[in-house]
């Protein structure tokens, strides 16, 4: 399925000597050693969890899930990304070593999904935060579609030139390194009347006759039982 035609093996001489470049050699070595950082926030991640089983066996592609961004070169975002989670996602992406890749999985990750119309806290597309290499639509995508997306990413890596990639990432970044988000006008300010919602009662406000009335109504046999 989606066989990868790598140019490294096309330039062979009559003496069976492979002539290639260092860039092509590094791309070839990364094809079967993608270590993903799983960033699952919603139901789309359940479909990706099916790949771990023996039916699909994503280990055959060299995928080794990592829990640390410093050991991963692929981050797979699956699910809804909220405004509160956006800085942490950008921080995880920046902690990953170069070269690094991103797969946006699911409609909620790509466009905000069903939350994009009336939700005040949903990011309308993860590509507004980090650059995306492969878009995987669906609600949710099937495991076969995830395998196809990984294969397409491997094809992209095989034809990649690293200096061109870093230059395009710098030009297409939507936020600066400091990630200072512009806070717009809020529909609801949230300034509630705290005195109306919460009125703590102290023991000094309870009349003495009320206190002794309820205390005398409880008999000793009831306390024993």
Swiss-Prot record:
Principal location class: plastid
GO function term, MF aspect, one: 4 iron, 4 sulfur cluster binding
Cell compartment(s), UniProt: Plastid, Chloroplast thylakoid membrane
Top-rank taxon: Eukaryota
InterPro entries: NADH_UbQ_OxRdtase-like_20kDa, NADH_UQ_OxRdtase_20Kd_su
Pfam families per the UniProt record, alphabetical: Oxidored_q6 (PF01058)
SUPFAM superfamilies to which the protein is assigned, alphabetical: HydA/Nqo6-like
GO terms, biological process: photosynthesis, light reaction
Gene3D superfamilies: 3.40.50.12280
Topology versus the membrane: Peripheral membrane protein
GO cellular component labels: chloroplast thylakoid membrane
UniProt cofactor note: Binds 1 [4Fe-4S] cluster.
Its EC number(s): 7.1.1.-
Binding site for [4Fe-4S] cluster: 43-44, 108, 139
Cofactor: [4Fe-4S] cluster
Keyword terms of this UniProt record: 4Fe-4S, Chloroplast, Iron, Iron-sulfur, Membrane, Metal-binding, NAD, NADP, Plastid, Plastoquinone, Quinone, Thylakoid, Translocase, Transport
Function recorded in the entry: NDH shuttles electrons from NAD(P)H:plastoquinone, via FMN and iron-sulfur (Fe-S) centers, to quinones in the photosynthetic chain and possibly in a chloroplast respiratory chain. The immediate electron acceptor for the enzyme in this species is believed to be plastoquinone. Couples the redox reaction to proton translocation, and thus conserves the redox energy in a proton gradient.
Subunit note: NDH is composed of at least 16 different subunits, 5 of which are encoded in the nucleus.
Name of the featured protein: NAD(P)H-quinone oxidoreductase subunit K, chloroplastic
Organism: Lactuca sativa
